[in-house]
Amino acid sequence: MDKNNCINRRKFLQMTGAAAAGTTAAMIGCSPHKDGSGALGPVPTDMMTFRTFPSLGDKVSLLGYGCMRWPTMPNPEGQGMIVNQEVVNELVDYAIAHGVNFFDTSPGYVMGQSERATGIALKRHPREKFFIATKMSNFSNFTYEASLAMYRNSFVQLQVDYIDYYFLHMLGTIGQRGLEGRFLDNGILDFLLKEREEGRIRHLGWSFHGTLEGFQQALALHDEIHWDFVMIQMNYSDWKNAAAGRNVNADYLYEELTKRNIPVLIMEPLLGGRLANLPTHIVSRLKEQNPDGSVASWAFRFAGSFDNILTVLSGMTQLEHLQDNIRTYSPLLPLNEEQKDFLYMTAELMLQYPTIPCNDCMYCMPCPYGIDIPGILLHYNKCINDGMLPRSRNDENYRKTRRAFLVSYDRTVEKIRQANHCTGCKQCNITCPQRIDIPTQLRRLHNFVEQLRQDTLDG
């Protein structure tokens, strides 16, 4: 690395105002804070950055549409929520009109409704205008028959006769719930390889969540199988600090794939939104560095600044998020080394905030006991980032922060869905890609809330 492009820690602290990290925010309450992502002018329609790899032959938009967070609405014909198909159609139309051509879904996304909604929206466009990616998400029943049925149903739901990018979903666990049990022992991987030979799968790869051993196990098959791509969680926080959250650092994953010439797809460039909802003093300093860019744009520019990245997926529920990301990649302005170093040090500073690494992926849902797991964890994280977590009773603002935390908790999460209803069944732990011990965290948060409520009664 060019020493002239490096910034030392003292300069970084001056840039971020880290000395203010421990101070109490001026506003009481755990409401979202402003991130500067308002109207930023026109959205380019013909300036999208594309990536092409000889091994794939596809011209893919650097911004990919993650279909895990399609907007929903109450079911007018019954209970629960359904995908708002009209809004999905509008988002897909807008994305394609502005150069986005990669759409990533799964049989399990959005309560099992994502593939169908994505298929309906894309069917209205010429097939050559888009690339579709979906997954074998055979987590609970991974017999050959069940896996085959899931695969064939994806074609029906998506209304296609070939799939551009097909994933072995969420590899990384050693044993029966990993590569061996879900894909090797049952023979389904052999079937998928034949499907690739016959063209119904154009490219075959996998997404990674898990341990170093799990990653190396899947990668070791490359010489025999020739993986066409791999998707990893990569952002400036996980680049060197993922191991702090029981995951594998993204710099290692990226380099191992790159030296084997395996194209990389990125998921969680925003860490489930956490890198767009940073502590207030970090937000202000990022805005000082780039007043016209959103906080999220820093994370997307980082993700796109590496040559071996095919596409960066973002689950864009709202039009303004889609517009912001299109601006960032139309065209991409890559980060220089000094800017990357600034973000690496920002990530180190973020470690001072004891947040729970929930990315709101919803893999833990639905809870069999109705608990709103992501809602509880994200509320806690928001209060930490806003400096509104009640701490010592001796703090001057303790009563105000205590009241604000409890009021916002009850408003954010229905009482019947709060942490005290957790039975510790650990079903959620099996599917959490961040490897969070969810029952332990829920028990800890419940005890914390009960202590605050008891303090209220005690005066």
Language-model region placement:
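N-terminal binding-site loop/beta-alpha segment at the start of enzyme catalytic domains
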Residues: 2-130, 161, 191, 197
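Conserved, mostly hydrophobic/aromatic
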Residues: 53, 65, 103, 118, ...
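Hydrophobic faces of well-ordered beta-strands that scaffold small-molecule active sites
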Residues: 61-65, 103-105, 132-134, 166-168, ...
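Residues that line or immediately flank small-molecule/substrate-binding pockets and catalytic motifs
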Residues: 67, 107-110, 167-170, 208, ...
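Active-site mouth loops of central-metabolism enzymes
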Residues: 71-85, 136-144, 286-289
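Structural motif corresponding to the early beta-alpha repeats
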Residues: 109, 125-144, 148, 169-172
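Glycine/proline-rich, positively charged
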Residues: 74, 141-265, 270, 278-282, ...
